[in-house]
Every structure is written in structure tokens, then in C-alpha cells.
């Protein structure tokens, strides 16, 4: 779907030329099929194979082990930046759009072109676009809130008949999201009043029986990171007048100052033998607070579609990498902001302050996860009690009942008591490795 959207974009009269750089990250057969599809769509395509990536790995600050078929974000972005810069400069491109492969190009391509033109004319260096649909966070950090929604919905459904109408979700959910940013996020620091506020799942069905059937059929997608019950609404506002300084970069970024792709490394601290997550944010902080570039966020929206993603095989690993990466970014950004724009090395006291804050923030966020884990375990127990008896199969059919039991079994496995103990030991071990200090010393 992303390639189809890019092909649509090339038909816009405002697009002179589009160069597509594809980074191999996955099975060789799958990558070959993607490249072939891009060329079928007549997209000017530059394919970057694993061999190509290995050729520049050390020069880019990576080790050969980073260049695998399942790369960490820091490695993927570092390589993407390098090859995109080479193509953009050789082909005379004046803007780079860096996207994750699961986002979708907006249908209104004329408005997209107009917005990019306006952002470029505003003399911005980097624009961090917004994401709607499923959030760009580990699946394990959006389970608890969705279980709250599922439990409330099923508790209400069991009191109704199969043909009873379903409550509309639009106005109710709009109240809960108004003025909130992280209403979908189990580890939210600010919008904690939405953690236990049930949202009404956005379902197509209009009767209770059909709605329950539809919802239950989607529950396993929560483990793949889909926002089944709390999708992110598209950001509202004007891309220029509502732009604001930010370093919270994700999978939708416009870069107008192309030299930043070579000058600023997109690396992250290495813990447990691999880079942690949030390297994009560290990159944005360096661009803004070391080099003084204009880095902003704007309601330049794309939808993230995780419907083709598989359930995460090791959700705790990705979650811990995210907690540690965010903690380091937040600490690093805080110290850089406090000292003012400067590209000089951190003083000894500043370096120690980063390390102190990073450990503090990591422990705070893991504490939030601890609460979330045990709350999810309790919600799983409540869900099991809610669906006892035959009401679910009577209301939505035997298949729905079987799907629900499968989902409950998966919850029991993911939120077993011993699982959290293993996760806590992994977190403590990674935090004690000294990778934060090593990164600052590079």
C-alpha cells in the first residue's frame, strides 16, 4: 500500500521527480518482491541490499552485527540516512521524506504537496510529522488500556440482546481524547486520567451480537501493536502556524537541510549488545540543540497501518529497549536545553547529570510498566470471569467464544507472574551495564 501511495504522489503536478530508496530489512525474497513491485509502478527505485549496508557499516558508526535482516531502529535509520543523502545530493533533490514501511500516503496528494511547499518556504530544517491509526510504540505498552476498553464493552454487551443497537463511539471517545496526547499509552506520564477511562471500540457493526463478534475477532491484533480500541485520531491544525519546537521524532519526517543526514549520527546507547530505541529523538535533539537547526513537529499526518505485522515474538525486549532509550533521550535533551545551543562536548558535570537523570527516568518508566503489567494481569482475570458461561457463544457464535479463549490463554502466558520477574532482571541488568556512559564518550 505504501508503494501504491507513492505512485499516486508521482502523478501530482507539483512533484517534479520522486526517488525511492528502499533499505533491505527482512527476508531476501520479500525485499526482492518489494523492489519488483516498486519498479512495476514505475517508481525510480534505489535498492540498498545487505551487502551494500555492510560496505558502509563501520564508516557509519555501526558494527557488522548491526547489519542483519532484523535491524534495530538506530541501525536502520543510520543506514537510511547515509544512502538517502547520497541519492538526494546526486539527483538534485531538495527534500527528503523518511517513512516507516507501515505508514500510508494520504489520499489528498495535492494537499500533501501544498503542505510540503509551505513548510519548505517557512525555512524549517526538519519537520516531524504526526502519526494516526496505530501508535509507533511497542505493542506491550498499549495492552492495558485496550483491556480496560474490551472489558467494559463485554460487560455491557452481556446485558443486551444480539439485535440491540450498539452505542455510537464518536462523540464519547472525542470527549476522552480532547486535549490529550497519550490517551492510548499504558506508560503515559501526563494523560494518566485516561488509563482507566473505557473507550468505545470503533466498530462497523451496528448490533450488539455482530459488534461483539467483530471485536473478539480482532483481539489478537493487540499483540501486534494495533490500536484495536483506541486508534490515534489524525492531528488537526495548520502545518505551519501550528508547528512547534519538538524532538519527538518517529516514522514520518521531512528533512530540508539534507546535510543533517550526514553530519548528525542517528545512533543510540548500546545495551545488551544492541542499540536501544529512540535514536530518532536523539538525532533530532542533536540537530536542534547542538547545531541550532529549526526542528519542529507539525500536524503533517500519515496513518500507520500495522494490520500486516506479526505479533511480537519478544515483546519485553522491545519494550525494555524503548524504556531505556526514552530515558536516555529525555535526560540528554534536558541537559542540552539547559546549557543552550552548543556543539562542544559536555562538561564532566553535565555528563554526570545526564547519567543520573537517565537512570532516574528509566526507573520511573519501568515503575509505570510494573503497575501496568499487574493491572493487565488483573484485567485478564476479570475478562475470564466476564465470559464465563454460554452467553458469549449465544450472542456472537461459537467461533467468537473460541477466539476469546485463545486470547485469554495468550494473556495468561504474557502476564504470568514469573514473566515480570524475568523482565525486571533483564531491565536491571541492562541499566547496570554502563552503555549510557559509553555512548556519551563516543
Regions found by a protein language model. Give the residues of each.
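Short, acidic, metal-binding catalytic loop of nucleotide-sugar glycosyltransferases
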Residues: 2-17, 27-28, 41, 121
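Short beta-strand-to-loop acidic/aromatic patch adjacent to the donor-nucleotide binding site
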Residues: 90-106
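Active-site-proximal specificity loops/subdomain of glycosyltransferases
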Residues: 30-93
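Terminal low-complexity segments of carbohydrate-biosynthetic enzymes
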Residues: 260, 301-442
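Acidic donor-binding loop at a coil-to-helix junction in glycosyltransferase catalytic cores
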Residues: 276-282
Amino acid at each position: 500500500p505504501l508503494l501504491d501511495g507513492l505512485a499516486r504522489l508521482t502523478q501530482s503536478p507539483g512533484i517534479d521527480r520522486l526517488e525511492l530508496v528502499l533499505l533491505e530489512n527482512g527476508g531476501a525474497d520479500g525485499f526482492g518482491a518489494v523492489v519488483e513491485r516498486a519498479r512495476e509502478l514505475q517508481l525510480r527505485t534505489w535498492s540498498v541490499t545487505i551487502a551494500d549496508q555492510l560496505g558502509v557499516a563501520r564508516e557509519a558508526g555501526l558494527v557488522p552485527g548491526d547489519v542483519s535482516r532484523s535491524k534495530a531502529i538506530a541501525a536502520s535509520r543510520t543506514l537510511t540516512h547515509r544512502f538517502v543523502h547520497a541519492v538526494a545530493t546526486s539527483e538534485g533533490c531538495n527534500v527528503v521524506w523518511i517513512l516507516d514501511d507501515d505508514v500510508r500516503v494520504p489520499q489528498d496528494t495535492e494537499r500533501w504537496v501544498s503542505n510540503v511547499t509551505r513548510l519548505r518556504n517557512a525555512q524549517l530544517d526538519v519537520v516531524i510529522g504526526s502519526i494516526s491509526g496505530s501508535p509507533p510504540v511497542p505493542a506491550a505498552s498499549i495492552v492495558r488500556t485496550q483491556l480496560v476498553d474490551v472489558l467494559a464493552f463485554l460487560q455491557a454487551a452481556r446485558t443486551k440482546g444480539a439485535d440491540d443497537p450498539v452505542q455510537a463511539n464518536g462523540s464519547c471517545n472525542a470527549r476522552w481524547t480532547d486535549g490529550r496526547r497519550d490517551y492510548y499509552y499504558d506508560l503515559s506520564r501526563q494523560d494518566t486520567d485516561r488509563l482507566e477511562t473505557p473507550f468505545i471500540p470503533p466498530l462497523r457493526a451496528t448490533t450488539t451480537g455482530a459488534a461483539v463478534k467483530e471485536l473478539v475477532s480482532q483481539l489478537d491484533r493487540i499483540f501486534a501493536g494495533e490500536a484495536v480500541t483506541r486508534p490515534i485520531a489524525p492531528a488537526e491544525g495548520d502545518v505551519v502556524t501550528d508547528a512547534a519546537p519538538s524532538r519527538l521524532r518517529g516514522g514520518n519526517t521531512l528533512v530540508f537541510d539534507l546535510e543533517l543526514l550526514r553530519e548528525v549520527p542517528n545512533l543510540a546507547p548500546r545495551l545488551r549488545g544492541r542499540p536501544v530505541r529512540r535514536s530518532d529523538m536523539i538525532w533530532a535533539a542533536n540537530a536542534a540543540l547542538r547545531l541550532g537547526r529549526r526542528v519542529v513537529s507539525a500536524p503533517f499526518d500519515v496513518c500507520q497501518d500495522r494490520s500486516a505485522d506479526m505479533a511480537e515474538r519478544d515483546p519485553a525486549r522491545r519494550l525494555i529497549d524503548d524504556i531505556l532509550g526514552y530515558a536516555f533521550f529525555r535526560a540528554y535533551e534536558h541537559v542540552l536545553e539547559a546549557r543552550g545551543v552548543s556543539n562542544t562536548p559536555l562538561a564532566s558535570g553535565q555528563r554526570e547529570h545526564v547519567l543520573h537523570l537517565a537512570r532516574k527516568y528509566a526507573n520511573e518508566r519501568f515503575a509505570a510498566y510494573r503497575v501496568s503489567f499487574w493491572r493487565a494481569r488483573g484485567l485478564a482475570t476479570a475478562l475470564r470471569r466476564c465470559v464465563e458461561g454460554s452467553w458469549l457463544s449465544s450472542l456472537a457464535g461459537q467461533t467468537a467464544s473460541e477466539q476469546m479463549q485463545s486470547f485469554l490463554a495468550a494473556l495468561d502466558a504474557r502476564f504470568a507472574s514469573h514473566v515480570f520477574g524475568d523482565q525486571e532482571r533483564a531491565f536491571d541488568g541492562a541499566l547496570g551495564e554502563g552503555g549510557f556512559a559509553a555512548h556519551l564518550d563516543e
